[in-house]
Amino acid sequence: MKPLPLPKQKNLRADCAWVIYQILEQGKSSRECLERVQRRHNARDNAWLQEMSLGVMRRLPLLQHWLRSLLDRPLKGNKKVIEHLILLGLYQLNFSRVSNHAAVGETVAAASYLNAAGLKGLVNAVLRNFQRENLADKPVDDAIINSGLPKWLFKAIENAYGDDAEQVHNETNAMAPIWLRVNKLQTSLAAFTQALDKAGVEYTLSANHADAVILTKRVDITALPGF
């Protein structure tokens, strides 16, 4: 696959699609690609870029299954990145807190920043059809797709763990909790947890680490008190 230059103008979703393209088509590392695009975005947007791009990777088998069922034929050449933009749109619609209106509208608009304004209609149609057909509610009869794992890893776990493989698949896909360490040079544990209570952020305290706070739900890190 030919190298794809970074979009000339910054755009959150176009840049995220570029990152996904670089990882899947060019074999680049997520860290390397994210560092390039994050230089031109603020902290809040950088957190979003990381959450979305890595989220697509985590749900890739299912997202690709949906994409194949929605596209008549694969896109080729320099338009291939639009498939990755659509993957991002599908992820937003089904696995993120992004509103459906923004997930569709902003993703469609991002095609212009990827030199594919002529494919905006295709992006819109695919995402609308995903909603219309309620694909997210239709069960997928494929253990590998449902596991969310690459085929080689799925089979390796099956061979190694036998009857316990399903539990291992589930644990592999579980998102780790976020741990925070309170900097006592800046604030106290009591003051920080009070701020979390006020912001409605759910957490627990660690029995083994006196300065640690464990967030029980995924949140936008940049929205935490004191960020």
Describe the predicted segments one by one.
Residues 1-227:
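Class I Rossmann-like S-adenosyl-L-methionine
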